[in-house]
């Protein structure tokens, strides 16, 4: 859910970050630092591909994350993003996102029959 709201109209992150989420597709993320902690998922970029090839991420890679979030420098730090990245196809207002979540929930409940929530 976090990635969906980061890519909303109201999110304060730079438009470059939002656009990268939209453009990434289902294979647009990498799981980094698999053999250490913290394990993170981030959008593919030259930086994250390099980190993935090394197999381990030095936490100094996160030092410039403000430049990524607010200046739009997509190579400044790993752009944290969840598995839902590939399901996000447009930047929407939060109100619309929540309405769609509720509609989808209600649709699934109807398919489940008499289960009441």
Predicted regions and their residues:
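Conserved active-site-proximal phosphate/metal-binding subdomains
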Residues: 1-117
């Amino acid at each position: 859910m976090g990635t969906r709201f980061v890519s909303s109209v109201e999110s304060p992150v730079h438009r470059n970050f939002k656009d990268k989420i939209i453009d990434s597709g289902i294979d647009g993320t990498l799981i980094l630092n698999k053999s250490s902690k913290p394990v993170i998922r981030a959008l593919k970029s030259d930086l994250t591909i390099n980190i993935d090839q090394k197999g381990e991420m030095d936490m100094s890679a996160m030092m410039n994350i403000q430049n990524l979030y607010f200046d739009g420098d997509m190579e400044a730090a790993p752009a944290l993003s969840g598995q839902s990245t590939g399901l996000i196809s447009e930047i929407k207002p939060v109100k619309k996102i929540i309405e769609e979540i509720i509609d989808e929930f209600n649709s699934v409940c109807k398919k489940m029959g008499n289960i009441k929530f």
